[in-house]
Amino acid sequence: MNTYLLEYKHILTPKKGFSKLFRDYTSESSERSELIAACFHLDYQKEADYYRQLGLLGSRTFERESLVRLLSRQNTRYGATALHLREIEKLRSPRCMAIVTGQQLGLFTGPIYTIYKALTAIIFAKRQKALFPEYDFVPIFWLEGEDHDYDESAQTAIFSENQVVHFKEEPYRRLPNQMVANSCFGEEISRTVEEYLRLLPETTYKKEVSEMLREFYYPGNTFEMSFACTMMRLFREQPLILLSSQDPDFKQLSSRIFLRELSSSPASSYNVVAQSSCLENLGYTAQTKPRTVNLFHVNHLGQRQKIEHPSEDSFSILPDKQRYSKHQFLELCQDHPEQFSPNVVLRPIIQDFVLPTFACIAGPGEISYLAQYRKNYEHFGISMPFIIPRGSFTLVEPKISRIMDKLLQVIGKPGVSRKQIYHAVFGDLQQLKKNAVGVTENPQLETLFEETKTEIRRALAALGPLLSKIDPTLEPLLAASTVQSAKIIENIEQKTWKASRRKHEELLEQILKAETALFPDGLPQERLINIFYFLNKYGTELIDTLKNLLNGHATEAHIIVEL
């Protein structure tokens, strides 16, 4: 199994790849230093900050007993083993810290980076234990089920016959803006599972995959239970703890932040706007737009409703605009915190208030919006944890590896390595196609065409002054001839390209197969393709393989794995 590391700054081929902020955050540059200083509290590349974070967390108090009871109850329900319950028990000690990651619920666990996040949290916790043996570090996976964007959660994709096939589970008796977690599956889920399995090739691992999906995805089960039980089964031999934030007991632990948000509104929004301005001054784009109140109200049907703050002394709940005095609303929140749900601005604050978060494992998009929250963390009186980039992979199947072999043969020069071919594929695939086709066998032909066009323009331009003296009416004819000559050369160039393309049609088709496999729908593979496509082919031990690979590398680089 071959692996290659690519720096994020070189990955430019996907339509929606890695943002400038993320590329700077994972680099070693002056831009990174400025970004860290302005937008974060800790730098994961600085050893001194690790001791500082231990001290910061050690000085805070957490509701550890309540947290252990909550997590034990939840994880037992999801199918936890004795290993998971032992990990949870460690949280009773003030010398136990959490390595937190999480993801929006997804169909059959959603895109494969969900798995990469969990693996990164497990590996990072293990590394910190090795560095600080007197402490414990437990990986916690936050189940983001309070989101009401059902359409985003209810889809996934796999490869089938060199094409990307999408699956989407239609909602069953679902109300508008209802939280995804408690959305139930109808009869349609059984048909979706069977169609998904039908498109997976027959392998020695298909029986295990089929049994798992049928066991957890069935009519009447909720989205969160299906997702959580699947994750627990996949990580049954790993010390990963799952956390559902929609639990009423967790809401009780979060209530102080809810009350602070309401009583100080719109302060947190002003903080995000101010931090966003700082971010934009550094040349980055702000991802998140805060609301006046960064909480939703949750009604008895599980629908998230926007909260407005029309005056200093009142709140209202949309869409009915039910009005409360400030005192009434704060009292409602204190008595019934389960009726409130944080939005994207407040969610990380809740996380790091309730949990002893030593580090948060985040993806490129999350790191971008967390860069907007520094002032808000300070507003709520807590420090930001370490923000660690999640592990990032592209899995290359043998048939795609063979295409890389062919590319190396066709365009490789003495000293060109396989890694450089991947650099070319991930850096500028369109240019690689041109190089592969070669515009015939003459690599200088493109330059010659450009030189020819330039020389013709120059020669015709030199005629201009003389023709003007002879007869000014000749000038338009000269101008038209200049345009026409350029078109003639371009026509010859296009025909040459087409002739060369026909000659290399087979290679271009293979490159297209590789493009589909590496950048399905123009996206990084990890953001679209589902883990069970690969588990069906390579078995659940693939998760252990990826964990071992991640253990051997830092997460500041993208890892290409030839399976």
UniProtKB/Swiss-Prot annotation:
<keyword id="KW-0175">Coiled coil</keyword>
<feature type="coiled-coil region">
    <location>
        <begin position="498"/>
        <end position="518"/>
    </location>
</feature>
<keyword id="KW-0436">Ligase</keyword>
<protein>
    <recommendedName>
        <fullName>Putative cysteine ligase BshC</fullName>
        <ecNumber>6.-.-.-</ecNumber>
    </recommendedName>
</protein>
<dbReference type="InterPro" id="IPR055398">
    <property type="entry name" value="Rossmann-like_BshC"/>
</dbReference>
<comment type="similarity">
    <text>Belongs to the BshC family.</text>
</comment>
<dbReference type="Pfam" id="PF24850">
    <property type="entry name" value="CC_BshC"/>
</dbReference>
<dbReference type="GO" id="GO:0016874">
    <property type="term" value="F:ligase activity"/>
</dbReference>
<dbReference type="InterPro" id="IPR011199">
    <property type="entry name" value="Bacillithiol_biosynth_BshC"/>
</dbReference>
<dbReference type="InterPro" id="IPR055399">
    <property type="entry name" value="CC_BshC"/>
</dbReference>
<dbReference type="Pfam" id="PF10079">
    <property type="entry name" value="Rossmann-like_BshC"/>
</dbReference>
